[in-house]
Amino acid sequence: MTKKQLHLVIVTGMGGAGKTVAIQSFEDLGYFTIDNMPPALLPKFLQLVEIKEDNPKLALVVDMRSRSFFSEIQAVLDELENQDGLDFKILFLDAADKELVARYKETRRSHPLAADGRILDGIKLERELLAPLKNMSQNVVDTTELTPRELRKTLAEQFSDQEQAQSFRIEVMSFGFKYGIPIDADLVFDVRFLPNPYYLPELRNQTGVDEPVYDYVMNHPESEDFYQHLLALIEPILPSYQKEGKSVLTIAMGCTGGQHRSVAFAKRLVQDLSKNWSVNEGHRDKDRRKETVNRS
């Protein structure tokens, strides 16, 4: 059996240069992430990792928060070089001293290496101590002029495979306003102005995924008119969401109970968007009334 290869990115660099944003970005890219890994534990940790998937990926922040960082990191990296089945890279995040000082002041943090409390002195000492590690790094990113969003985009371009770099998933869901708006929704649309199948006895206990309800909802002229305007609004903005580095866009369609109208609209929207995008369909409250009746 061919041994699976472990892909590791060691995230390090200057304090305040963006390591927190970086590790969150790697998580979005499908990496298993750990923040503040003591260097001495790294080889043992990698040995204990159970590789369950092809080409597993890890991203670990290793920095000066560990007191033994400067004394241990070189020996650890030498050991990793000789470890079979491991492909590892070092990502070093840097920024200009002036920008780092501004970031420390903005967060009201003191620099851990500034014995006298002067942030700039701590930064200069840190830069001197990290110089050998920076020279070893395969990827050095200067975040001086980067916003968090721009840093995420930069890392996605450098560490995603081609399929991931182009990935963008749309979640289309239905819900009932009476149960609350989904907290993770990016776009919310209200279809409560449309005729409600609930008031037709033969349709009341069905849902928008059932053909009779779907046809009833979508065959009304006002439904078709609204849907065409909805599609014309959504389709042109999807590339912009993708360009900005958003990995998941959640579109929520709501009606009163989330059983009929919103379900039908979500179903149709999925059918159309799926022609050009990766789309998942979900109906949060579709069966809620049925479950309530069964419990009573």
From Swiss-Prot:
Family the entry assigns: Belongs to the RapZ-like family.
Could you tell me which InterPro entries the record lists for this protein?
P-loop_NTPase, RapZ-like, RapZ-like_N, RapZ_C
Keywords in alphabetical order: ATP-binding, GTP-binding, Nucleotide-binding
Residues that hold ATP according to the record? G13, M14, G15, G16, A17, G18, K19, T20
- List the Pfam families: PapZ_C, RapZ-like_N
As one GO molecular function, the record gives: GTP binding
Origin species, per record, is: Streptococcus pneumoniae (strain ATCC BAA-255 / R6)
Residues bound to GTP: D63, M64, R65, S66
Q: What does this protein do?
A: Displays ATPase and GTPase activities.
Name-wise, this protein is Nucleotide-binding protein spr1424
Q: What is the lineage of its organism?
A: Bacteria, Bacillati, Bacillota, Bacilli, Lactobacillales
